[in-house]
Amino acid sequence: MKNQDKKNGAAKQSNPKSSPGQPEAGPEGAQERPSQAAPAVEAEGPGSSQAPRKPEGAQARTAQSGALRDVSEELSRQLEDILSTYCVDNNQGGPGEDGAQGEPAEPEDAEKSRTYVARNGEPEPTPVVNGEKEPSKGDPNTEEIRQSDEVGDRDHRRPQEKKKAKGLGKEITLLMQTLNTLSTPEEKLAALCKKYAELLEEHRNSQKQMKLLQKKQSQLVQEKDHLRGEHSKAVLARSKLESLCRELQRHNRSLKEEGVQRAREEEEKRKEVTSHFQVTLNDIQLQMEQHNERNSKLRQENMELAERLKKLIEQYELREEHIDKVFKHKDLQQQLVDAKLQQAQEMLKEAEERHQREKDFLLKEAVESQRMCELMKQQETHLKQQLALYTEKFEEFQNTLSKSSEVFTTFKQEMEKMTKKIKKLEKETTMYRSRWESSNKALLEMAEEKTVRDKELEGLQVKIQRLEKLCRALQTERNDLNKRVQDLSAGGQGSLTDSGPERRPEGPGAQAPSSPRVTEAPCYPGAPSTEASGQTGPQEPTSARA
């Protein structure tokens, strides 16, 4: 144990970061811990004696609990020391194993011991197995073991060498046979050179393989040494854990004895508590009888209140049926209004912009009314939910006897609020009915105006057609007159001797192309010009389409 404690101290010096805050595990520390636990128990003893008039049983319990705590703390410390030393050694050995797999062979055992001394300033500790030191790497026992391993390797190699010699003899005979087949010495030399080159390549490959195998062998030797060290550490940890288990068994026995004593004391306390509990039960029974008398009176009052609530619920159901009928009537009116709106939309598609604006305004009002109807439906659902809540409250009212008066007052207030809301809703329904009636009247007036205007448009179209016919007849007459004037002007140019009186008819003949435009306007004071009449033709259909 002392050698292991020294090893733990050296490991903590080499790796102070791996176990911060842990106490140093040395021979002196291990000897001082029990001595420190004993004064703690002694310190508790006089303190308990100085306490003012404590019972002797309580003092004994405190002393036993303090001693058990000290023992448990000491055992936990020992366990932490074992785990810390073993885990620290494993952490130190882990990176070496990883590095040995991918790197070349490390220096020999002498160099390892030197590096250990350079790091810690102490010689490498020798592990202890079952109270005896394990032989170090430089001891003669280990050298004998290695020599025996080498002798076994040689014995294993001899049959392999014999097999190789037999194989070489066969190859030589085959080579001689091939050389005998050749006729000239030059061919024999060439064959030998080829064979020699092949053997050289094989020899080089074998040397490379030998180097790789040697590296692997050195790595395996290092791993073997490392595993031996870990095995020794595991054996030491096992021995320490066995000792700890024994101490824990002793500690468990003492805990069992304490548990038995506490159980006896608790039984005595339980008997005292039962006697006190019976006395309190008798008092409670007397109080229960008094409360039963009060509860009987409260039940009668609650029955009367329940009858009143039933009457209120029946009245509320009747009012609900009336509201349902009103809503059905509203739905039917809404359907009629929707049908009328569809007809009005079909009729108003061909109206002018003013009619279209008024129609949009009416449609907006209809949408708002629908929205209000939906809000009314939502309020209806909300009222139904409130009714369900009131029924649940009524059931709770029967269960809770003490809070019956408060619940009844709150229910009355809520019923009054509901009646006020219903009155408000009825007023709103009357308002919306009046609005719907006004909108229907406006729609009927618009339809009558449209029919009147359609009749006026038909009369105007008939007048326009008559005017167009008259204009066409006038245009034909004008064309005939123009032709006659042109003929007359052509006959007048032949006689150059004619003077002023013969030139007068040429004036209107020369102005004839421009005169018809002037003559068209006074012919029909009520009719428009030809250009205007030409434009009115396509304009009227557009107005009709609108």
Swiss-Prot record:
Biological-process GO terms, alphabetical = B cell activation; exocytosis
Q: Name one GO molecular function term.
A: syntaxin binding
- Superkingdom of origin organism: Eukaryota
Q: Which residues carry this modification: Phosphoserine?
A: S72, S515
- Alphabetical keyword list: Coiled coil, Exocytosis, Phosphoprotein
Q: In which tissues is it expressed?
A: Ubiquitous, with much higher expression in heart, kidney, liver and pancreas.
Task: Give the UniProt entry's GO cellular component terms.
Answer: cytoplasm; cytosol; extracellular region; membrane
* Segments of skewed composition (Polar residues): 11-21, 530-546
Which ranges are annotated Basic and acidic residues under compositional bias?
70-80, 143-158
- Stretches assigned to coiled coil: 186-491
Disordered: annotated span: 1-170, 482-546
The protein's assembly and partners = Binds to the C-terminal coiled coil region of syntaxin family members STX1A, STX3A and STX4A, but not when these proteins are complexed with SNAP25, VAMP2 or STXBP1, suggesting that it interacts with syntaxins that do not form the SNARE complex.
Q: What is this protein's function per UniProt? A: May be involved in intracellular vesicle traffic and potentially in calcium-dependent exocytosis in neuroendocrine cells.
Which family, according to the similarity comment?
Belongs to the taxilin family.
The entry's protein name is: Alpha-taxilin
The species is Homo sapiens (Human)
Q: What is the phylogenetic placement of the source species in the record? A: Eukaryota, Metazoa, Chordata, Craniata, Vertebrata
